[in-house]
Swiss-Prot record:
GO biological process: apoptotic process; mitochondrial large ribosomal subunit assembly; mitochondrial RNA processing; mitochondrial translation; positive regulation of mitochondrial translation; regulation of mitochondrial mRNA stability; RNA processing
Subunit composition and interactions: Monomer. Found in a complex with GRSF1, DDX28, DHX30 and FASTKD5. Associates with the 16S mitochondrial rRNA (16S mt-rRNA). Forms a regulatory protein-RNA complex, consisting of RCC1L, NGRN, RPUSD3, RPUSD4, TRUB2, FASTKD2 and 16S mt-rRNA.
Protein name from the UniProt record: FAST kinase domain-containing protein 2, mitochondrial
Species, as recorded: Pongo abelii (Sumatran orangutan)
InterPro entries in the record: FAST_2, FAST_kinase, FAST_Leu-rich, RAP
One MF annotation (Gene Ontology) recorded for this entry: rRNA binding
Similarity annotation: Belongs to the FAST kinase family.
Compartments (UniProt record): Mitochondrion matrix; Mitochondrion matrix, Mitochondrion nucleoid
Domain RAP stretches: 618-675
Domain of life: Eukaryota
Taxonomic lineage from the root: Eukaryota, Metazoa, Chordata, Craniata, Vertebrata
Keywords: Mitochondrion, Mitochondrion nucleoid, Phosphoprotein, Ribosome biogenesis, RNA-binding, rRNA-binding, Transit peptide
GO cellular component terms given for this protein: mitochondrial nucleoid; mitochondrion; ribonucleoprotein granule
Residues bearing PTM Phosphoserine: 110, 124, 692
Length: 693
């Protein structure tokens, strides 16, 4: 016993001569010892060789040692201690990092079981006390390959935790991405209840300030995606550390930080990090070399970012246009929509690339492009026609719901792809079984809004199939959805009996009126107008008791140029009326009264003395671009219905396009309206009248 004690204290004295007082061994709560370096310019090898020259081996200082509190050679202030117990291995459960000047020499094992120092070995870059007890560092990729569940990763951590802890969170998120939604929910519950999960979180918080910045970002992103609540101390701590170390962000970290900000919910720390991110991007934008990183940063910068920063990013993207891949060009639409920045040059150039590589374009890409064009109000007819023609050319390989989704997006843009819509109508007529409650309403809305069935060859067959499909769901459809469907039929001038009869029941009407939704009231009024003005013989006797609608408000500034042209053409304002309100809540911009041969405009003062059968009422409507299908003169659903109803009330309708009228000189505008108002035979006479005025 005395020999053992003498040997131990001899070893301790040797150890105290090697370790300076500026080196502290801190014992953490989890039983992991971690050195705290106070001075980094001391080299353990500087005097080691001279001290050990007399002998080739020393006893391994920690073999069969005791942990105890001592003031000899150690700084003990603020250091946790353990009760004295015998240990057979090191307490170092993780890799310890020192600089190269402080690395310990490697240890070999002799035949008698003692460990000796190899003095001739090259100095290592890491402080390795023993190869047998140090756990091997394992990457997140290897963890995700070897483990099949989130619990497996936590089990691996509990057996031999390694630095950095971010690898475990990254591995768990990688595994979670491979699981189905149900499996993912189950695995997350097991993860939160695992005994090692809290320990892993503690390690993560301790290591946040010393691990590489990219690992910190990887772990924060993985935590958010794994569903760890954002208001926890763990996530908020990592957010604060991320803010403090944001200057360490390189190009790779910018990409990861963008993904982190995009995945997180708004809060104070996220807002502060977002502001710091914008400042960092403003400083480093010209240093970004990877196009994908640039697009990720642009997408994350936010719609409320300063316009100067948006333009700087736009200029950077324009500089990199030659390096854009096809995928970069396809992705650029979504990027610009995310930052709410309409760069016509970028959009035009990327549109050309998309059209040149349209074959094989996935549905998801097309959806993103069309949705982004709507958000940016970017109307490129060549792009839309190219996408529609591609879908029409490959129509047979597309499923019903995918084609319908594309058509819905085109309708949102106001674009009418004639060929594609004809093919879709044909498929519906040939396969009515493809219709269900989920696709009947959007199909009706799309075709009625774009006014496509007008003059179509298979119009009647299509409408009958749609009405029959809707009738099959009348026992389950809600009152509001039924109203939407019937309103779509009204726009298409088709009135199926069964849906109308169910909608016009008193309890259904009462339910719709008590919803306090003015859109429902408006549609019911339009339904009532259709019943009175359109050809609905079997429904004309039905009278609806509806609340009064507010009058359709005329434009706050009526088209002054059209009024001036009419005054010049007709011989003064006494020959036409402005802002005329009609029954059924209709409004027209100008009204002119002519003889039935359209040879002469009648002054308003003479109308009362003229027989109504000798008068032709002319309604002049000043319409905007949105009233037509994009890039055409084809009126959309509501304008077509309004024209139909004005005709039923005895009007001849003249459409004047506001944007075209604004471009015309006064003389050309007069000529344009003259050809619209007068008949061909009356044009020479009208020309004489214009010259005289």
């Amino acid at each position: 016993m005395n020999n053992k004690a003498d040997s131990f204290f001899w070893n301790l004295r040797q150890f105290s001569t090697l370790v300076p007082t500026s080196r502290t061994m801190r014992l953490y709560r989890l039983g992991l010892c971690k050195p705290k370096i106070v001075h980094s310019n001391w080299n353990i090898l500087s005097n080691f060789h001279n001290r050990m020259r007399s002998t080739d081996i020393i006893r391994y200082l920690f073999q069969d040692a005791f942990i105890f509190k001592s003031d000899v050679g150690f700084q003990t202030k603020g250091i946790s201690t353990l009760t004295a117990r015998r240990i057979e291995r090191l307490l170092y459960a993780r890799r310890l990092f020192f600089d190269s000047k402080q690395s310990l020499v490697p240890v070999d094992k002799s035949d008698d079981g003692l460990k000796k120092v190899n003095l001739n070995h090259e100095v290592s870059n890491e402080d390795v006390l023993t190869k047998e007890t140090k756990p091997n560092r394992i990457s997140s990729r290897k963890l995700s390959q070897e483990c099949n569940s989130l619990s497996d990763v936590l089990d691996a951590f509990s057996k031999a935790p390694t630095f950095p802890s971010s690898n475990y969170f990254t591995a768990m998120w990688t595994i979670a991405k491979r699981l189905s939604d149900g499996q993912k929910r189950f695995e997350k519950r097991l993860m939160f209840s695992h005994p090692a999960f809290n320990q892993l979180c503690e390690h993560m918080m301790r290591e946040a300030k010393i691990m590489q910045y990219k690992y910190l970002l990887f772990s924060l992103y993985s935590m958010v995606k794994l569903g760890i609540p954002q208001n926890t101390i763990l996530v908020q701590t990592l957010l604060r550390v991320t803010q403090e170390r944001i200057n360490e962000c390189d190009e790779t970290c910018l990409s990861v930080l963008s993904a982190v900000l995009e995945a997180m919910e708004p809060c104070k720390n996220v807002h502060v990090l977002q502001m710091g991110f914008r400042i960092l991007v403003d400083q480093q934008v010209w240093k970004i070399e990877d196009v994908f990183t640039l697009q990720v940063v642009m997408k994350c910068i936010g719609k409320d970012a300063p316009i100067a920063l948006k333009r700087k990013l736009e200029m950077k993207a324009l500089r990199e246009l030659d390096r854009f891949s096809v995928l970069n060009s396809q992705h650029m639409f979504e990027v610009l929509a995310a930052m709410n920045h309409r760069s016509l040059t970028l959009l035009d150039e990327c549109s050309k690339v998309v059209l040149d590589n349209i074959h094989g374009c996935p549905l998801r890409i097309m959806i993103n492009i069309l949705q982004s064009c709507k958000d940016l109000q970017y109307h490129n007819l060549d792009l839309f026609k190219g996408l529609a023609d591609y879908v029409a050319a490959t129509f047979d390989i597309w499923k019903f719901r995918k084609v319908l989704f594309i058509l819905i997006l085109f309708e949102n843009l106001g674009f009418r792809p004639v060929g594609l819509m004809d093919l879709f109508m044909k498929r519906i007529v040939e396969d009515p079984e493809s219709l269900n409650m989920k696709n009947i309403l959007p199909t009706l809305h799309t075709y009625s809004s774009l006014n496509h069935v007008y003059k179509c060859q298979n119009k009647e067959q299509f409408l009958e199939v749609m009405a029959s499909a809707l009738t099959g769901y009348l026992h389950t459809i809600s009152s509001e959805n039924l109203l939407h469907a019937v309103y779509s039929f009204c726009l298409m001038n088709y009135f199926p009996l069964a849906p109308f009869n169910q909608l016009l029941q008193k309890d259904v009407i009462s339910e719709l009126l008590t919803s306090d939704d003015m859109k429902n009231v408006y549609k019911l009024h339009m339904l009532d107008t259709c019943l009175k003005l359109d050809d609905t013989v079997y429904l004309k006797d039905i009278a609806l008791s509806l609340p009064q609608l507010p009058r359709e408000l005329p434009p706050s500034h009526p088209n002054a140029k059209v009024a001036e042209v009419l005054s010049s053409l007709l011989g003064g304002e006494g020959h036409f009326s402005k802002d005329v309100h009609l029954p059924h809540n209709y409004h027209i911009d100008f009204e002119i009264r002519m003889d039935t041969n359209r040879n002469q405009v009648l002054p308003l003062s003479d109308v009362d003395t003229t027989s109504a059968t000798d008068i032709q009422r002319v309604a002049v409507l000043c319409v905007s671009r949105s009233a037509y299908c994009l890039g055409s003169s084809h009126p959309r659903g509501f304008l077509a219905m309004k024209m139909r109803h004005l005709n039923a009330m005895g009007f001849r309708v003249i459409l004047v396009n506001n944007w075209e009228m604004d471009k015309l000189e006064m003389e050309d505008a007069v000529t344009f309206l003259k050809t619209k108002i007068y008949s061909v035979e009356a044009l020479p006479v009208a020309a004489v009248n214009v010259q005289s005025t």
